[in-house]
């Protein structure tokens, strides 16, 4: 084990007596590394009350769990003194971005994340000009990556691989068949489902028959349909959820980054949760994920009218409808809190609000948006109500996500899980530690159908995190979005230390495949 553990935490040659010792002897015979977590507060990911325990890891799996009172006996296992710290399954991020072939996920490991879910919002990581993920998946299999990866098939990628132009609304039967065949291939390769980005080009142009055709393919493999829905505006969200459910069935529908833009208060949140619960009462396994921040992060294309989005000739729009576009943008930004409510995250205005950037350029903010164009910037949009979002966040059927990636200028990419522990568990007591961990581990594992992750039990994969909840800190802010979380002492991925002593120490991640 790493040099960063203290002598008290490293007590070589001691494991529990009896059956635990026999596991260690077997591990030595197989020349597999064995590690004993001794006297930890085991929070196992099921929601069960935490309990003091000893946990033995052999190779990449958890091999034995015993009472902390078990007596020690000599063995080759290395021992980590838990000292009552929480030992939990590694966190499973339900909505992630980036590419482990090119990006470091150290900041994710720093907040206890051991598995990310890529292919979100209809688009995946860099998968080559042929738009086929097979070569990318093979490259991840060969590479040394620092985190586990679950991959979704991207709706945008499927469309383009099938030769469907971005602007097409109605697909002909041949186009539908090509998309379905490509999706079937990706599901057979191990994709966990499909993702949609229906508020973005080209998903914004897709219609229900196209989505339903894909849902049937996903259902054959027991996969999930995750969606950045058609609209997250408060007056349109129920219609968007309806579309997600009806177009996914018989596959399982899942709401990505559950939110209500412009919605206010606990009452409205309860209405939305009741709306979702009604589907579940009817036997539809509708789930959702959410991050604990009131600002989203996306491109400024979301501010523009559909008629000004690609593949429309933007120059022609400016020549013919500039004033109409300007009026639309002013109305849109006014409803979304004004130019102070958009914090730009990309050059050359990174770290400035739209109001500040416009002042710097000496122009009205609407004119700056027009100058930038739909694809000209991304940023944090402060459009959500904390009371409403927190009410959604603590619901038992809502798991957690970052919707973040390496280098993103939003604190959710570096602070989500630390914030959940620091604020929602320790400070505000909105969640018990057992429930917070279940929603970060067991629940997402159930949604993705990961039978051997998200739980601490004999036979499960050894993705583990060791920490004292009272010492966890989410250090990132909107001003300093890259500060790593603190307080997660050891993060283990597939039985090997991945993060320890405040830095990444291993590359034991794997590309996971649906079964």
Language-model segments: residues:
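Acidic, glycine-enriched loop/beta-strand segments at the rims
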Residues: 42-54, 379-384, 388-389, 428, ...
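Histidine-rich, glycine-flanked metal-binding segment
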Residues: 14, 30-35, 42-90
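N-terminal secretory signal peptides and thylakoid transit peptides that target proteins
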Residues: 2-17
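Histidine-centered catalytic micro-motifs
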Residues: 91-100, 198, 225-231
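Divalent-metal coordination cores built from histidine and acidic residues
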Residues: 85-87, 94, 102-196, 215-216, ...
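C-terminal cap of metal-dependent C-N hydrolases
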Residues: 320, 391-397, 402-403, 416, ...
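Active-site neighborhoods of metal-dependent hydrolases
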Residues: 152-153, 157, 161-173, 179-200, ...
């Amino acid at each position: 084990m790493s040099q960063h553990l203290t002598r008290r935490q490293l007590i070589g040659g001691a494991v529990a007596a009896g059956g635990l010792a026999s596991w260690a002897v077997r591990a030595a015979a197989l020349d597999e590394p064995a590690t004993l977590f001794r006297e930890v507060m085991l929070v196992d990911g099921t929601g069960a009350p935490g309990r003091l325990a000893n946990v033995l890891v052999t190779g990449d799996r958890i091999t034995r769990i015993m009472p902390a009172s078990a007596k020690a006996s000599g063995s080759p296992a290395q021992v980590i003194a838990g000292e009552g710290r929480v030992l939990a399954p590694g966190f499973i991020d339900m909505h992630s971005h980036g590419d482990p072939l090119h990006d470091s996920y150290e900041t994710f490991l720093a907040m206890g994340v051991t598995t990310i879910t890529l292919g979100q919002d209809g688009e995946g990581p860099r998968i080559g000009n042929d738009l086929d993920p097979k070569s990318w998946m093979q490259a991840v299999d060969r590479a040394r990556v620092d985190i586990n990866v679950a991959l979704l098939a991207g709706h945008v990628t499927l469309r383009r691989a099938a030769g469907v132009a971005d602007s097409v609304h109605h697909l002909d039967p041949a186009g539908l068949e090509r998309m379905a065949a490509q999706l079937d291939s990706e599901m057979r390769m191990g994709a966990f489902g499909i993702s949609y980005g229906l508020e973005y080009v080209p998903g914004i142009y897709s219609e229900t028959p196209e989505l339903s055709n894909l849902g049937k393919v996903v259902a054959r493999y027991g996969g999930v349909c995750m969606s950045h829905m058609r609209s997250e505006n408060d007056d349109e969200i129920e219609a968007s959820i309806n579309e997600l459910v009806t177009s996914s069935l018989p596959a399982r529908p899942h709401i990505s980054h559950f939110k209500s833009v412009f919605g206010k208060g606990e009452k409205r949140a309860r209405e939305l949760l009741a709306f979702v619960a009604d589907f579940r009462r009817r036997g539809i396994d509708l789930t959702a994920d959410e991050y604990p921040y009131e600002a989203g992060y996306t491109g400024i294309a979301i501010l523009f009218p559909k008629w000004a989005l690609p593949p429309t000739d933007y120059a022609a729009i400016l020549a013919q409808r500039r004033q109409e576009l300007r009026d639309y943008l002013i109305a849109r930004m006014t409803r979304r809190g004004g130019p102070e409510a958009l914090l730009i995250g990309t050059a050359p205005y990174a770290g400035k609000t739209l109001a500040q950037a416009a002042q710097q350029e000496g122009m009205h903010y609407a004119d700056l948006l027009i100058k930038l164009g739909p694809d000209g910037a991304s940023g944090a949009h402060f459009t959500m109500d904390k009371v409403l979002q927190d009410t959604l966040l603590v619901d038992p059927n809502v798991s957690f996500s970052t919707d973040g990636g390496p280098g993103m200028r939003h604190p959710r990419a570096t602070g989500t899980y630390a914030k959940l522990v620091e604020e929602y568990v320790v400070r505000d007591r909105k969640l018990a530690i057992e429930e917070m961990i279940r929603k970060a581990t067991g629940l997402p594992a159930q949604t993705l159908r990961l039978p051997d992750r998200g739980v601490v039990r004999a036979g499960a994969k050894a993705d583990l995190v060791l920490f004292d909840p009272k010492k966890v800190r989410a250090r990132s802010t909107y001003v300093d979005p890259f500060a790593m979380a603190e307080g997660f002492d050891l993060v283990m991925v597939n039985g090997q230390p991945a993060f320890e002593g405040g830095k990444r120490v291993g590359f034991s991640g794997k590309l996971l495949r649906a079964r």
